[in-house]
């Protein structure tokens, strides 16, 4: 009988887009029968109180220095191994705004975790005003975060004009391969059903241009 793999979800995005709030919104909807663990940066956008999460029965591991892209390797491996001892159903990872999401995914797919983990839906939270700004769109880090995600989340939509949102959707529709889902949210509130949206592994790669 094949070993059941633990699902892993990555939430990436630039600083200030609402990644931590998005993670908290998912936690608030968690099935009480599911066991989650969380891997976060030492310094989140608005902070995740490890003590509070422990009270809720959700183990939390923090990467020292606050940057998963720098910690991919021994620190990240050690944190993952510790979390897996809890035999979780899901691992939720909030990446630093400076993290290359593809590097984090590569670490998850490498030994010794390849046989233990299933890379499930990957989220990237963006501010549509940045997404349509060429100064952001041409940054390698930004393209990496956009390219690796399955679900592109437009946050802070209440601060955008209708024209900006229309341009966001126009550009998002032209991404190749297309995203499994492109959504608008307010206050970074995600739908927990998106965690189990079907994803295609080969659709994740680093875009050359938006």
Segments from the language model and where they lie:
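A broadly conserved amphipathic alpha-helix scaffold signal in soluble, globular proteins
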Residues: 102, 106-109, 150, 170-173
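A short alpha->loop->secondary-structure connector
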Residues: 111-117, 142-143, 169-176
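C-terminal accessory "lid"/substrate-recognition subdomains
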Residues: 2, 151-154, 160-210
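Flexible active-site lid/hinge loop adjacent to a nucleotide/diphosphate
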Residues: 136-148
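Nucleotide-state-sensitive switch-loop elements of NTP-binding domains
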Residues: 2-12, 17, 21-135
